[in-house]
């Protein structure tokens, strides 16, 4: 049996508890609907994250293969010198947006892809294979930024799902059962008190009638 609330067994408390139960059940339904919607949104974004992860792994494989070919073409030392002369790429700005009322990051950044002239290294000291390396790693950066946003969104949604689940369970298995058990107890206690009063009044009436007849 659920633990009872510490309240007086009065009709006022009974009415108050019934109202609280109605509100708790409405709150439970709203939270359950929110939980279900969050879970659906989570798995939608999870599918996107899996796809982005697969694409990123493929792009990284292509980028490192291109890097190996460039090292063979111009040499490791020269490739390092070229990499040090590359101009910084785009800046990334992190804002916030809401997904199912959950604040999640929104990474605002232009594509990292640039043409060879924007990268800053001299054409005469470079090669087509070096350009390909830069191109491939810029593609990696684009995907990595998008994946970071999606994975952080998943983490925050997962936390919100867990918090909502705990609230749903608390209402469903603790709070509402305690109030319902207390309502049942108060009803039983009020019935007992009513019967006691009835028999008390009956005895008083019998005594009065007995005295009146003597």
UniProtKB/Swiss-Prot annotation:
The keyword Ion transport applies. Pfam families: ATP-synt_D (PF01813). GO terms for cellular component: plasma membrane. GO terms for molecular function: ATP binding; proton-transporting ATP synthase activity, rotational mechanism; proton-transporting ATPase activity, rotational mechanism. It is found in: Cell membrane. One of its GO terms (biological process) is proton motive force-driven plasma membrane ATP synthesis. Keywords: ATP synthesis, Cell membrane, Hydrogen ion transport, Ion transport, Membrane, Transport. It is a peripheral membrane protein. Component of the A-type ATP synthase that produces ATP from ADP in the presence of a proton gradient across the membrane. HAMAP family: ATP_synth_D_arch (MF_00271). Has multiple subunits with at least A(3), B(3), C, D, E, F, H, I and proteolipid K(x). Belongs to the V-ATPase D subunit family. This is A-type ATP synthase subunit D. It comes from Desulfurococcus sp. (strain SY).
């Amino acid at each position: 049996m659920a633990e009872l609330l510490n309240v007086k067994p009065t009709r006022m408390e009974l009415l108050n508890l019934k109202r609280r139960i109605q509100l708790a059940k409405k709150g439970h339904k709203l939270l359950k609907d929110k939980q279900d919607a969050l879970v659906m949104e989570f798995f939608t974004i999870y599918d996107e994250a899996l796809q982005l992860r697969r694409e990123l792994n493929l792009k990284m494989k292509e980028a490192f293969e291109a890097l190996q070919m460039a090292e063979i073409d111009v040499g490791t030392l020269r490739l390092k010198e070229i990499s040090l002369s590359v101009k910084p790429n785009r800046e990334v700005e992190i804002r916030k947006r809401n997904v199912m009322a959950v604040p999640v990051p929104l990474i605002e950044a232009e594509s990292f892809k640039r043409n060879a002239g924007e990268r800053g290294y001299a054409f005469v000291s470079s090669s087509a294979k070096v350009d390909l390396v830069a191109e491939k790693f810029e593609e990696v950066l684009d995907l990595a930024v998008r994946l970071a946003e999606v994975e952080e969104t998943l983490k925050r949604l997962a936390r919100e799902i867990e918090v909502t689940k705990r609230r749903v369970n608390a209402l469903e298995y603790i709070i509402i059962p305690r109030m319902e058990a207390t309502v049942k107890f108060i009803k039983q206690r009020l019935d007992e008190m009513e019967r006691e009063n009835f028999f008390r009044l009956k005895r008083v009436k019998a005594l009065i009638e007995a005295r009146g007849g003597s």
